[in-house]
C-alpha cells in the first residue's frame, strides 16, 4: 500500500459515450509524517464484460479474451520494475491480504498489475496508460491535483449489471512509491451511458443485419483499443475548484468556451492598447481560433456522421404513445402515455379511456428484459426473457363501473437504461393486464352492441347484486365452475383463464369478487428508459471527499 491517499472527482454521475470524460485526480500525503516520494503515477480506463455461461455461449468470446490479455501486456509496459520477492513469505502474504481488504491491488510489475483480473473477464475497452506525474515529492499534508480529459468512443458498451451479461468500467490509477517496489492500482468505478442521440427506435436485431451497424453500435467481439494520449494537466487545488464551478459544480462546455473566448478577446484588446501592431495581435488571435476549429473538426467529424445516421434510422419508426387494447374485434380501452421516453426518477403518467363495462381490474407494471442474438444464446427467446425479466414498479386499480382512469408510476433510479449492442441489448415494456368478466348472453349476441344498450339490457349494478346473491346462497356448484373453467381455459390470442379468490397468475390481480367467470387480456407496450444526469454537489469543497477506490 502507498503512504498517500488517492481520490477522484467527477462533475457528473454518468458519462455519455462519444463525449469527453473529465475528472480531477488528487494525491494527498495524510498517513506519513515524512516526505513521500512517488516515482510514477499513471491512469487508464478499463472496460470489462462478464457473461453467464448458462444463458450465453461463452466459448464464442475465447479469442476476444486472449486478444484483450495480449493487448494488456503490450500497452502496460511503461517501465520494468523488479519483483519485490520471488520467494514466499508471511509478510508478503499479509500485505496482499490487507491490500485486498482496503481495495488496492499490488503487483511486482505493471504487466502483472494489468493481469490481476478475474478469469472470466472479457475486455471491451482499453486505453493506453497516461502518465500523470514522475518523481513527485509530497510533504506531510501536501496535495497534488491532475486534470485528466479523454474522449470516450461512441461505440463503447454502456455500464450495465444484469443476469446474462454485465459491463463494468473503471478508472485505474497506478502508484509506484520509492519505499515500496510494488505497483499499487486503485480502481474507481465510472458509469457510461449511451449517447443521447444513440437510441434509434428499433428493436434488437433490426440493426444487427444493417450494413452500417458496425459503425453505430458496439461490437463486443472486437474490443476497443485506444492508443491516443489523453490530456493531462497539473492544476492547483484552487484552479481545480474553479474548473468545477461554484460548490463543486462544473461549468458547462459552452460556458467554459465562452469564458476562454472572452479572456482571449481581453488579452487582444490589451495588446492593442499597449501599442502592439494590429497585424501581429490579430493574426495570432485568428490563427489560434482557426487551429481550434480544425482540431474540433478532426475529432468530431466521424462521430457527427454516425449520429446523423442514427437520427435517420430513428425518424423512420417513431414510437407511439396512444394504443388501443382490443379483444374479439372490440375495443376494450384506449391507453395514453405522456411520452415514449422516460428518465430514471421521472413520473410516468398513464390514462385509460373508454373502459369496457365488463372490465373489473387493471394491472400495469414496468419491466425489463435482456435480449441476446440467436447466434450466441443457449435458450430460446422465451426462456431468456423468463430468466432475465425484472419488474421495477407496478400498480393495481379496481375500475368497476369506471369509464376513465388515470395512474402514475415513478421510474426507480436503479432501473437500467434501454440500450443495444450488436450482440446484447436491454428492452423495457409496460405490461397491461385487464381482468374482464365473462357474460354468456353478451358473448352469444356478439361484440357489436354499444355500451349504453349493454347497460340497459343488463345493468352492471344488477349483475353485481346477482353475483353477490349467488355467492351468499351458495348456488355456485362445482359442476358449473368446472364447466366454465373448461370453456374459459381456451386461449384465442389472449391469456384466458378462470379468476378466483386465489389467482395463481404472475400478475397476481387481487381484490376481485369471490368467484366469477372472467378472462384476462394482456398486452405489452414498448417504451425507452434513459439515465438521469446528476451534477455532483460540493465537489472539491466542503463535505464531499471524492470517490474512493473500490
From Swiss-Prot:
GO terms for biological process: positive regulation of TORC2 signaling; retrograde transport, endosome to Golgi. GO terms for cellular component: cytosol; Golgi membrane; nucleus; Ric1-Rgp1 guanyl-nucleotide exchange factor complex. Residues 463-494 have a biased composition (Basic and acidic residues). Residues 247-266, 272-291, 442-502 are annotated as: Disordered. It holds the Pfam family Rgp1. Restores G1 arrest under starvation conditions to sat1- mutant. This is Protein sat1.
Amino acid at each position: 500500500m502507498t503512504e498517500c491517499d488517492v481520490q477522484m472527482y467527477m462533475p457528473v454521475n454518468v458519462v455519455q459515450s462519444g463525449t469527453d470524460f473529465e475528472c480531477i485526480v488528487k494525491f494527498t500525503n495524510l498517513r506519513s509524517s515524512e516526505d513521500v516520494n512517488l516515482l510514477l503515477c499513471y491512469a487508464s480506463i478499463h472496460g470489462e464484460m462478464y457473461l453467464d455461461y448458462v444463458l450465453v455461449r461463452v466459448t464464442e468470446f475465447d479469442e476476444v479474451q486472449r486478444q484483450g490479455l495480449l493487448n494488456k501486456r503490450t500497452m502496460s509496459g511503461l517501465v520494468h520494475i523488479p519483483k519485490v520477492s520471488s520467494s514466499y513469505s508471511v509478510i508478503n502474504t499479509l500485505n496482499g491480504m490487507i491490500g485486498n481488504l482496503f481495495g488496492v491491488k499490488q503487483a511486482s510489475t505493471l504487466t502483472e498489475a494489468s493481469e490481476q483480473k478475474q478469469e472470466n473477464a472479457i475486455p471491451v475497452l482499453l486505453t493506453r496508460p497516461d502518465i500523470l506525474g514522475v518523481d513527485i515529492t509530497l510533504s506531510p499534508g501536501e496535495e497534488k491535483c491532475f486534470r485528466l480529459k479523454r474522449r470516450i468512443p461512441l461505440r463503447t458498451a454502456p455500464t450495465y449489471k444484469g443476469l446474462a451479461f454485465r459491463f463494468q468500467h473503471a478508472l485505474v490509477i497506478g502508484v509506484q512509491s520509492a519505499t515500496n517496489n510494488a505497483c499499487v492500482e486503485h480502481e474507481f468505478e465510472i458509469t457510461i451511458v449511451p449517447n443521447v442521440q444513440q437510441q434509434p427506435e428499433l428493436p434488437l436485431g433490426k440493426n444487427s443485419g444493417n450494413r452500417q451497424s458496425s459503425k453505430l453500435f458496439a461490437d463486443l467481439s472486437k474490443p476497443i483499443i485506444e492508443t491516443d494520449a489523453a490530456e493531462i494537466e497539473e492544476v492547483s487545488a484552487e484552479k481545480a475548484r474553479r474548473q468545477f464551478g461554484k460548490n463543486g459544480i462544473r461549468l458547462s462546455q459552452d460556458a467554459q468556451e465562452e469564458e476562454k473566448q472572452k479572456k482571449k478577446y481581453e488579452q487582444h484588446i490589451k495588446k492593442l492598447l499597449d501599442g502592439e501592431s494590429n497585424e501581429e495581435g490579430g493574426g495570432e488571435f485568428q490563427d489560434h481560433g482557426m487551429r481550434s476549429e480544425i482540431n474540433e473538426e478532426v475529432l468530431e467529424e466521424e462521430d457527427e456522421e454516425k449520429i446523423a445516421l442514427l437520427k435517420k434510422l430513428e425518424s423512420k419508426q417513431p414510437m407511439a404513445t396512444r394504443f388501443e387494447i382490443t379483444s374479439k374485434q372490440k375495443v376494450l380501452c384506449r391507453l395514453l402515455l405522456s411520452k415514449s421516453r422516460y428518465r430514471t426518477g421521472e413520473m410516468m403518467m398513464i390514462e385509460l379511456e373508454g373502459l369496457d363495462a365488463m372490465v373489473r381490474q387493471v394491472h400495469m407494471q414496468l419491466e425489463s428484459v435482456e435480449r441476446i442474438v440467436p447466434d450466441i444464446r443457449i435458450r430460446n427467446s422465451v426462456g431468456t426473457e423468463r430468466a432475465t425479466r425484472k419488474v421495477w414498479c407496478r400498480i393495481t386499480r379496481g375500475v368497476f363501473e369506471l369509464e376513465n382512469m388515470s395512474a402514475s408510476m415513478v421510474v426507480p433510479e436503479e432501473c437500467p437504461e434501454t440500450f443495444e449492442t450488436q450482440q446484447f441489448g436491454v428492452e423495457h415494456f409496460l405490461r397491461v393486464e385487464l381482468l374482464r368478466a365473462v357474460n354468456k348472453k353478451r358473448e352469444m349476441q356478439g361484440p357489436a352492441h354499444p355500451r349504453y344498450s349493454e347497460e340497459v339490457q343488463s345493468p352492471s349494478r344488477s349483475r353485481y347484486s346477482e353475483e353477490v346473491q349467488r355467492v351468499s346462497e351458495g348456488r355456485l356448484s362445482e359442476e358449473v365452475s368446472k364447466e366454465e373453467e373448461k370453456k374459459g381455459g381456451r386461449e384465442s390470442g389472449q391469456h384466458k383463464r378462470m379468476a378466483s379468490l386465489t389467482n395463481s397468475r404472475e400478475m397476481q390481480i387481487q381484490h376481485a369478487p369471490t368467484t366469477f367467470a372472467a378472462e384476462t387480456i394482456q398486452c405489452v407496450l414498448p417504451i425507452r428508459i434513459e439515465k438521469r444526469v446528476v451534477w455532483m454537489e460540493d465537489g472539491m469543497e466542503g463535505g464531499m471527499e471524492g470517490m474512493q477506490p473500490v
